[in-house]
Amino acid sequence: MAFGTDPTPDGLANPPIDDLMKHADSKYALAIFAAKRARQINSYFTQLNEGLLQNVGPLVEYQNNEKPLSIAFREIDEGLLEETLGEDDANEGN
């Protein structure tokens, strides 16, 4: 068993922020995009335990201890999601 750091970082360092920024106009937009998807994933897991399936589950393979935000970032990085602005998002900041 080797000791030390894992060569492939998990969490916010993987995927790198520079790769994620290719899929959003700004860091703010990326944060909102990922947070919304993470809430959907979290709702999916909650509904899965209750036998309801109203949200789409993770689009990438995940591990049981992985956080919904990390899953959302990986989905964004792999190009599986497309950001679209709703009415509330389009009017924000005006």
UniProtKB/Swiss-Prot annotation:
It comes from the Bacteria. GO terms for biological process: DNA-templated transcription. The RNAP catalytic core consists of 2 alpha, 1 beta, 1 beta' and 1 omega subunit. When a sigma factor is associated with the core the holoenzyme is formed, which can initiate transcription. It catalyses: RNA(n) + a ribonucleoside 5'-triphosphate = RNA(n+1) + diphosphate. Coiled coil: none annotated. GO terms for cellular component: DNA-directed RNA polymerase complex. HAMAP family: RNApol_bact_RpoZ. NCBIfam families: rpoZ. Promotes RNA polymerase assembly. Latches the N- and C-terminal regions of the beta' subunit thereby facilitating its interaction with the beta and alpha subunits. Belongs to the RNA polymerase subunit omega family. Its EC number is 2.7.7.6. Gene3D superfamilies: 3.90.940.10. Pfam families: RNA_pol_Rpb6. One of its GO terms (molecular function) is DNA-directed RNA polymerase activity. This is DNA-directed RNA polymerase subunit omega. Keywords: DNA-directed RNA polymerase, Nucleotidyltransferase, Transcription, Transferase.
